[in-house]
Amino acid sequence: VGGIAAMAAMVGLAIYMLIRNQILYKKKMKKEAMQEEVDSTISKLRETKDKREALSLFREHSRDELCDVLNFASDTFNRSVHGFMDENLRELRKVMSAIEEKKSYLKQVKRVGTLGVTQLEHDIAIDKGLYYYQGNDFASEIVFSIRRLTEPGKEHVDNHFSPLCEVQKEDFGKMTDEIVSFLNR
């Protein structure tokens, strides 16, 4: 009888370790993909000697990053609000984790922007660099704001406070849909 229980415990431990390793592997691969994207932009900016091409690459990089942040904001805001309305603590934790990943990614992107600004002509660098840093700060602020919205919702659900009534959910849902549609424009 003791041997069967020990074998069952070992099988359970093995299954747990396999699942845990798979989850950690996926996180690692996602992080490496984000780093690879940043590295490819850096290499393109370093390789170019033409100031106009550098400006074009810098604009493309800025546009892509800001669009990505707005799409991320739309998705995480929607997930955060619906996680709160549905009292889905797991979803709210996933949103918080995604926000932390995005914050670190935006820091890396800001460093790429610094490199990009150095590749531009001096007069253009002053003008475009200012807008780039301002855009990056706005993007960081959007992510920070969603975090500040998600934290109280997560705490509310985690502490098992009374849920929203249907009227509140309906009003909150309408407002959420308007904000998400605005971000997706």
Regions found by a protein language model. Give the residues of each.
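Cytosolic, long alpha-helical scaffolding segments
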Residues: 1-185
